[in-house]
Amino acid sequence: FAAAGIDSSKDLYAVIWTTTPWTIPSNMAISVHPRFDYTFFERRVGAAELCGEEDCSAVKCGQESDGDIYVVAQGLLGAFLADVGWDEKDIKVLGECKGQALELLNTKHPLVDRKSPIILGEHVTLDAGTGSVHTAPGHGLEDYEVGCRYGIEVFSPLDSRGVWTDAVKDKDLEGVPYYKGNAIVIEKLQNCGALLAQQDINHSYPHCWRCKNPVIYRATPQWFVKVDKFRDETLAAIKDVKWIPASGEARISNMVEGRTDWCISRQRAWGVPIPVFYCEDCGEVIVTDETIENVAKIFEKESSDAWVKYSAQELLPAGFKCPKCGKNHFKKENDIMDVWFDSGISWRAVVEKRSDVLGHTPVEMYLEGSDQHRGWFQSSLLTAMATEGKAPYKSVLTHGFVFGEDGRKMSKSLGNYIRPDEIIKTYGADILRLWAASVDYRNDTKIGNNIIKQLAEIFKKTRNTSRFLLGNLFDFNPAEDYVRYEDLTELDKFALYKLNQLIDTVTEAFDNYEFYKYFQQLQNFAAVDLSSFYLDIVKDRLYTAGKKSLSRRACQTVLYEILQTLVRILVPVMPHQAEDIWMSVPECQKCDKSGNSLESILLSDWPKARPEWNNSALEDEFSKILKAREVVTRAIEPLRADKKVGSSLEVAVYVSVNDNAVLKANEKELSNIFITSQAYITDEKPSDVLNEYKEDDYTVWVTKAEGEKCARCWKYRKLNSDGICQECLDAIK
């Protein structure tokens, strides 16, 4: 103080600020931030301000005088003066220092005959107040933690009902509920001249998350696990676990690295008891291998209810005496284990005790909500590291929470949740499973009637696709009709190439637990690759080609492979639909690779991609064909809209494009792919053009189709006397 030019003979006050005046009697320290600047200032006051009564006989009354000296954080000085209603003109700044310089200076408690040291705390902020924080280790977590670092007593003179005990040593407070204490403490501070100001403000306050009632913090004696003893080993073990998503590793690492000792005791009437005894003669805490083993044997026979049923003497080994004083009067611990400790040892209780069935730890996966990094994932990890020295799991998957379509989090207490059995009753279990697979579970997600209805439509499309496949395989026997890969058309090979891609991407999605990608790939394959492309094109081959022709059997071969793969891919998410499809598959198509008939699709192997189908050259080839198909479709559409043509089979298309090598090589198949009666690759504009359409470097001319409409295939061609084309005549013969 001398260095700052401050007269140490004057009264010096550290100003604190609190929203819980009732905790002032429990104040044990004042916290300041080590790196904040603190200002010492003197307030010059007159008699009128010193006392409200003109005839007051106080020593300082009636004279102009230097006032007391106060210390407040520099960053809050202006706000502080405004709060207490002091004029800056009456303030004389005497000096400044860092909070670090104030460490371990003692202050005198205004209401209790004890000293409160100034300590350093990183939790101190400049958001509000004075920068000097009232610290009561018995009534706040941060206060408790900073107090422990300085060895400050944890003083909490309240009982379990929130009523002051005689430990408060204040007759005005003993037996009074804490919530009535604010008025009493404020009056006491006023009476002793220690209250500078008070005001009403709105601020957040802790409430019970379940019943929504306000709560208070009260420190009580507890049992702890000293995490420091195995923290480094735990952090190392975290790196060996696969975290899904990967961000989970950093999250739990930060929690373990920064966590304090783990409090494992709870004050409840039910739960697993803590097997500790106390000597009633000398107070010795008794917890030994011998006593724990004896209690464990009793619990194994009679369950943990025996702790309530029997006395301490009956639970201890026969003839047991206190190892400290030799007496034999004992009482039991009344606290129970933290339920997180209970769930945290499930790896031992469930897995290790049934190792003949489940194997040994580490287990393959723990799966729970993202809040369990602080809960089950961490408690399981800590118990396993403390006792086994290894993580109890190989991988951990976390998911977000479910919200309604209105964006509100679903909660049992709010009653705004959808019952799964209602969805199952209305739509079936597969729809609920499909919803779970469709969402990116790594984030919070939504569910509601509209979302379920949309998924039901997707489900129907998948089902309709399967019906189409089944309907066109009724006469296909793979043992007799299967067409070799080399005899398939380029279109057929491309369909199998896309099927191979589906197998690879879906398998990878499952391997990485990215089920939403499975949903996206399956939906895209069924809607785009099949319904809108391959199946749309091959209908003509299936319906008009000869029943046993190579063209039809080749197409059926592809449909057979698609169905065999699709039904297996459906199994993990939509097992009921998969089994329903399988029941409709002809018996000759139900054999596995060994030729054995599969009674249920659930017994089949997962599909594997075929190396011979991986013809990547088809990707580039058909990307150009698909582009041309899209352009041709857009060229025909205005004619259909104007009702100049009804079906695309009524037209012929002439396509001009700079890079036409691929289209020219497949020119004979283009009319089938475009679903027109004729298709030509040419740079010459035909006559009688119905529509000319340009897009990028494409030019498409649309004309009336050549010939007459075949009564069987509906294509426009040269017809015979029976009114059908030559291709249909050959098919009939």
Feature names for model-found ranges:
Residues 1-25, 44-46, 51, 104, ...:
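Residue patterns forming the tRNA-binding/recognition surfaces of aminoacyl-tRNA synthetases
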Residues 38-43, 65-135, 141, 145:
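Protease-associated
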Residues 150-162, 268-270, 292-444:
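Alpha-helical recognition segments enriched in aromatics with Gly/Pro capping
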Residues 205, 276, 319, 707-710, ...:
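Residues immediately within or flanking Cys/His clusters that coordinate Zn2+
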Residues 208, 279, 322-325, 710, ...:
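Short cysteine-rich clusters marking metal-coordination/redox-active sites
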Residues 216, 287, 329-331, 715-721, ...:
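Short functional micro-motifs and their immediate structural scaffolds
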Residues 267, 283, 326, 714-717, ...:
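Cys/His-coordinated zinc-binding microdomains
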Residues 330, 476-504, 536-635, 639-657, ...:
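Acidic, turn-prone loop/beta-hairpin segments
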